[in-house]
A protein has these predicted regions:
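Short, structured motif recognition centered on aromatic/hydrophobic residues
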Residues: 76-85, 95, 115-116
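Bacterial N-terminal signal peptides that target proteins for export
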Residues: 1-10
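Short alpha-helix boundary/capping elements
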Residues: 84-91, 123-124
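Acidic, glycine/proline-rich low-complexity segments that act as flexible tails and inter-domain linkers
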Residues: 9-16, 21-75, 104, 128-142
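Substrate/cofactor-recognition hotspot
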Residues: 118-120, 124-129
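Extended intrinsically disordered, low-complexity coil regions enriched in Ser, Thr, Gly, Ala
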Residues: 91-113, 128-139
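Aromatic- and histidine-enriched alpha-helix N-cap/loop-to-helix transition segments
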Residues: 74-78, 110, 123
Length: 142
């Protein structure tokens, strides 16, 4: 379990070092896919030490999973990622990054607040409080 959390935290932390986005077309449902995720952080940070992990991070997680254009939009994927991190109790800089990413992908403050309120009942009240502190920073709420 600790290894799993460490790997998830490492993957999320890698995001802090170089996820880039570019404009894209639309989903199969005709909704705009606002961004395409491009990632080199895995190779930049861990390329020589853990080349397989770096490749999975850059090519699979970001190259395929985040860019999959089917039923989920990038906005929805961002919200799911925030919920996943909060539910695991990961409330460090990786969660802050993903809250910022969600905001950049169109998640409003109201949507973020409702999402964290919902997950609080299943993941725990203290985790939600910790997440809300980061939401206030990202959305610049006093």
């Amino acid at each position: 379990m600790k290894l799993k959390k460490a790997l998830i935290t490492a993957a999320a932390t890698l995001l802090l070092f170089g996820a880039a986005v570019e404009a894209s077309a639309e989903t199969p449902q005709g909704e705009p896919m606002t961004k395409k995720i491009l990632q080199t952080a895995g190779r930049d940070v861990l390329g020589k030490m853990a080349p397989d992990f770096a490749r999975y991070n850059d090519d699979i997680l970001f190259g395929e999973v985040w860019n999959k254009q089917d039923a989920l939009s990038v906005k929805q994927r961002s919200m799911i990622t925030v919920v996943s991190l909060v539910s695991q109790g990961i409330t460090d800089s990786s969660l802050k990054y993903h809250i910022q990413n969600a905001k950049n992908n169109g998640v409003t403050l109201e949507e973020m607040a409702d999402t964290i309120t919902q997950v609080a009942f299943y993941a725990g009240w203290p985790k939600a409080w910790a997440a809300f502190r980061l939401v206030k920073e990202v959305y610049e709420i006093q």
